[in-house]
């Protein structure tokens, strides 16, 4: 089964991707993970990607397509995969379709996680992280016991650059402008299914399983 997850930043795609990957025994392929590794290793790709990500912008198509193709060519993708973070533009989607078609494959379902913009904004701007131990918090949904202090190591928790109000607004604007046309692209192919992304994590997962059941019979 070959699946794509779509949805705005902060919609919980990464969390649902892990659940789906485990449920259906397919690899979870996150372009975010690929970029983070390159950024950590300070590769040319990582340096270039970081410049865009720090501004809340999407990484250009040409930087991402070949690395995704290489990943999809690995043995563990023969029985299927779940793409999280790719494609983000119609151009990327067309490149993916061409690659899959050349190998007699196709996308089985595009799962769109739909969350209101206002909720996304609250989710993202409220996130905090401990720079020392990596523990994560949320000022509204998962606050630390002591304000601005990590429960684990007692160091100050911080807001990442990606989670500031201005950056979140920019990221959502970029998503709406560049990514949402994918919805129409996949609607024309008849492979898109939309689920409500609000509520408890397990509730969203049950909705995802119900939608995916149509291609798992």
Curated annotation (Swiss-Prot):
Subcellular location: Cytoplasm
One Pfam family, short name: ADK_lid
Region (NMP): 30-59
Disulfide topology: none
Enzyme class, broadest EC rank: transferase
Main location: cytoplasm
CDD domains: ADK
Annotated positions binding ATP: 10-15, 127, 136-137, 199
Enzyme Commission code(s) on record: 2.7.4.3
Source superkingdom: Bacteria
InterPro entries given in the database record: Adenyl_kin_sub, Adenylat/UMP-CMP_kin, Adenylat_kinase_CS, Adenylate_kinase_lid-dom, P-loop_NTPase
Amino acids binding AMP: 31, 36, 57-59, 85-88, 92, 160, 171
Pathway(s) this gene product operates in, as recorded in its UniProt entry: Purine metabolism; AMP biosynthesis via salvage pathway; AMP from ADP: step 1/1
Single Gene Ontology BP annotation: AMP salvage
LID: region residues: 126-163
Subunit structure: Monomer.
NCBIfam families referenced in this protein's UniProt entry, alphabetically: adk, PRK00279.1-1, PRK00279.1-2, PRK00279.1-3, PRK14527.1
Family: Belongs to the adenylate kinase family.
The protein's name: Adenylate kinase
Species name: Clostridium kluyveri (strain ATCC 8527 / DSM 555 / NBRC 12016 / NCIMB 10680 / K1)
